[in-house]
Amino acid sequence: MDISTPCIKCQVHSKYIEEQSEPSKNRYVFAYIITIKNLSKTTVQLMSRSWLITDSNGKQLTIEGDGVVGQQPVIEANDEYTYTSGTVIETPVGVMQGHYVMTDHKGIDFITEVDPFRLAIPNILN
């Protein structure tokens, strides 16, 4: 597996979901929207994902699985794929990071890193 990423960029936006959260029970729900941009000249396919989620107490959760939201999307050259998913942590602040395993048009697997992004309720300092 190649660890270099051929022109794949990921943009992430996270959002606190107040109506599904229960702070009194240490339940904080967050949605995240990820856009994967294929800036290369060839088609790629997202095969699997791996996430490390850490709350502000240092509790960690690793999530791995095939595809994203039940799909293994094919992303054409100069196109993008956006999806929304979510996670629950026990603190009002956390961080999430990970990577995707993708396959290029020649069937060669490579890793696309997703830089750490913050999960936080609005207007909180930590």
Curated annotation (Swiss-Prot):
Under InterPro entries, the record lists:
ApaG-like (IPR050718), ApaG_domain (IPR007474), ApaG_sf (IPR036767), Uncharacterised_ApaG (IPR023065)
Pfam families the UniProt entry points to: DUF525
SUPFAM superfamilies xrefs:
ApaG-like
Could you tell me which residue ranges the ApaG domain spans?
2-126
Name the record gives this protein: Protein ApaG
